[in-house]
């Protein structure tokens, strides 16, 4: 959605109860409609407590509220998602379908905004499981753009039982040693700090059975740093290069078995300039991980026990 379309949407949007246009609505209804049309969600508590009183007091106009929302990082993310999002989604589905068969799976940060089966099954994991355990923050503790979904305790699906645990993925102490065949972390490690990431990888090592796998995909900082002012997600704490994340993973004792990239971005790196269209037009899984928009790992817990491996020799 462009800025122009967002504004036109507000001008043309009619309130379902009464057919009133935006200019005729009460301040409360106009405020809510601005969020629904521009950000595609209800107003959050912060906006309601800060912006709405100023609108009602005449300190802000409706046009200023609209401009504030259109200028937000969240709106820019929605605009990018309209083109790049579906392409990345396709590539991530390909990656998930390539993960090994497992009976018991731990999915870190795995709630799905619109599918209670969770991210792993929702994106096409092809094997039936005994159980998928999804660990994610309680909905009210997540960033506002991630509060949809993940409100169940369990769900029986055609692929197996899905159970939810609502707490930080940095604390896996509630799970027994060597109790999972596969751990999946899809677009979640970038939402926590570096020290917390070390806790996650140590926890993953402990709960994986010997020979078990960690599948992980995350933005590649070598590419996303070209974006700068239009940073992909307001909730990201840190994005890693291949070299940085490989070293962190291997310090936990896990071994990088396969390293791939999703959505080739080599042309952007050569030009030194990010192009959403270029990246969106190159979906798929690539061997040149350091030159892709997302990096995707398959890591293994060695049968012989913890042994720190030297970092993978890669660019980035």
Regions found by a protein language model. Give the residues of each.
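Substrate/cofactor-recognition hotspot
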Residues: 6-79
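Class I SAM-dependent methyltransferase Rossmann-like catalytic core
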Residues: 76-100
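Class I SAM-dependent methyltransferase SAM/SAH-binding core
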Residues: 110-172
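A short acidic, Gly/Pro-enriched loop at the edge of an enzyme's catalytic core
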Residues: 170-183
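A short glycine-rich, Lys/Arg-flanked "PGG" loop and its adjoining helix->strand segment in the class I
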Residues: 198-213
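Short, glycine-/aromatic-enriched active-site segment of Class I SAM-dependent methyltransferases
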Residues: 216-236
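Short alpha-helix
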Residues: 237-253, 259
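A C-terminal cap/extension of S-adenosyl-L-methionine-dependent methyltransferases
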Residues: 258-316
């Amino acid at each position: 959605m462009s800025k122009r379309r967002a504004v036109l949407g507000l001008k043309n949007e009619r309130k379902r109860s009464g057919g009133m246009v935006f200019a005729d609505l009460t301040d409360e209804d106009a405020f809510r409609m601005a969020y629904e049309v521009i950000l595609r969600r209800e107003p959050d508590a912060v906006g309601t407590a800060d912006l709405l009183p100023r609108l009602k007091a005449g300190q802000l106009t409706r046009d200023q509220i609209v401009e504030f929302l259109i200028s937000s990082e969240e709106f820019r993310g929605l605009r990018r998602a309209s083109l790049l999002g579906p392409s990345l989604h396709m590539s991530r589905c390909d990656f998930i379908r390539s993960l090994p068969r497992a009976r018991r799976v731990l999915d870190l940060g795995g709630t799905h905004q619109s599918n209670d089966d969770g991210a792993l099954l929702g994106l096409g994991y092809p094997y039936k499981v005994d159980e998928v355990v999804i660990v994610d923050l309680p909905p009210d503790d997540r960033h506002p753009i991630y509060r949809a979904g993940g409100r169940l305790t369990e769900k029986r699906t055609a692929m197996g039982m899905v159970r939810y645990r609502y707490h930080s993925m940095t604390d896996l102490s509630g799970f027994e040693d060597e109790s999972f065949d596969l751990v999946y972390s899809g677009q979640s490690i970038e939402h926590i700090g570096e020290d917390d990431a070390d806790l996650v990888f140590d926890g993953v090592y402990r709960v994986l059975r010997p020979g078990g796998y960690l599948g992980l995909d995350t933005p590649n900082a070598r590419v996303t740093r070209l974006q700068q002012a239009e940073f992909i997600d307001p909730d990201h704490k840190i994005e890693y290069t291949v070299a940085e994340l490989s070293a962190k993973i291997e310090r936990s004792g896990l071994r990088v078995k396969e390293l791939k990239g999703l959505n080739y971005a080599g042309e952007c790196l050569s030009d030194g300039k990010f192009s959403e269209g270029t990246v969106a037009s190159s979906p798929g899984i690539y061997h040149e991980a350091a030159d892709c928009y997302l990096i995707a790992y398959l890591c293994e817990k060695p049968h012989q026990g913890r042994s720190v491996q030297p970092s993978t020799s890669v660019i980035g």
